[in-house]
């Protein structure tokens, strides 16, 4: 079975309860490794009045060298250690504060995530599954990252792409956790062309649509203008480049050379993988719109995620593309209001994320 490294997220959230309640079923389709120290796990289990059997847990430690070892088997738990350069001393000796934003919990969740990420990178597991963190807790812990995807870009020095959804609808985000006022400045021919090229090469979706940035997709330049001035040109260029089968070196050169761009367009015949014009966003998510195209790219976060979650909240997942590791996540937050209350929780997104990671690795 495939091995999944699972980071604990924010220990004050519903993440640990999702993990424990799902463990038996999850273990039927993969071998999970949970990145949490035994002492902290026991505190959480006591608060939840739950038990965890036949599980593998990984205690992580800051060290200059990478080392993975089996430590012991105790109370039906297999305990391992993973040493690596984390940049912070690991402190697992703090109290769980259910539903509260806490810097210690934030830092611990980050280190669990970083350790699990490199565990996969070092080939000890096949994919990474992350449970939800709280961005304010990360900020209070002095961390510079706005979330998992932002951190993964820094870890691996790659331009990670965030994609969310399910088999009925997937959406790639051109921009993520940035203020809306900054999005238009980010939309350049170069930035968008690189994104569209990378998004296709990571997914190989056969038909994709780019959602308009402005209302009515700009109405032929009447509103805004990004669609006609930038987006249509980037779509045409990327479609022509992908059709040409030319290499990355040529792509980088053509980005700066209008003559090469014209040459590509002249030689391009037929349909591209991207629809030629930006789609009007307010109709793209209707039944008719999704029947036409259900693999989309959005210029900003809420343009895609508001309708996605309205339609498929229970089973949507988060996938990080364009990285040296496979990373998936649940598509929901910390749900502090439900944490440690034995409330009814939906684990469908968690299972869908795990299954997606397993299938993706099998196809690799």
From Swiss-Prot:
Where does the chain bind a divalent metal cation? 177, 216, 301
Under the heading HAMAP family, the entry gives:
PdxA_Epsilonprot
Q: Which Gene3D superfamilies match?
A: Isopropylmalate Dehydrogenase
Q: Which InterPro entries match?
A: PdxA_epsilonprot (IPR037539), PdxA_fam (IPR005255)
- Could you tell me what this protein is called? 4-hydroxythreonine-4-phosphate dehydrogenase
Can you name a GO cellular component term?
cytoplasm
Q: Which keywords appear in this protein's UniProt record, sorted alphabetically?
A: Cobalt, Cytoplasm, Magnesium, Metal-binding, NAD, NADP, Oxidoreductase, Pyridoxine biosynthesis, Zinc
Q: Which GO terms describe its molecular function?
A: 4-hydroxythreonine-4-phosphate dehydrogenase activity; cobalt ion binding; magnesium ion binding; NAD binding; zinc ion binding
- The primary gene name is pdxA
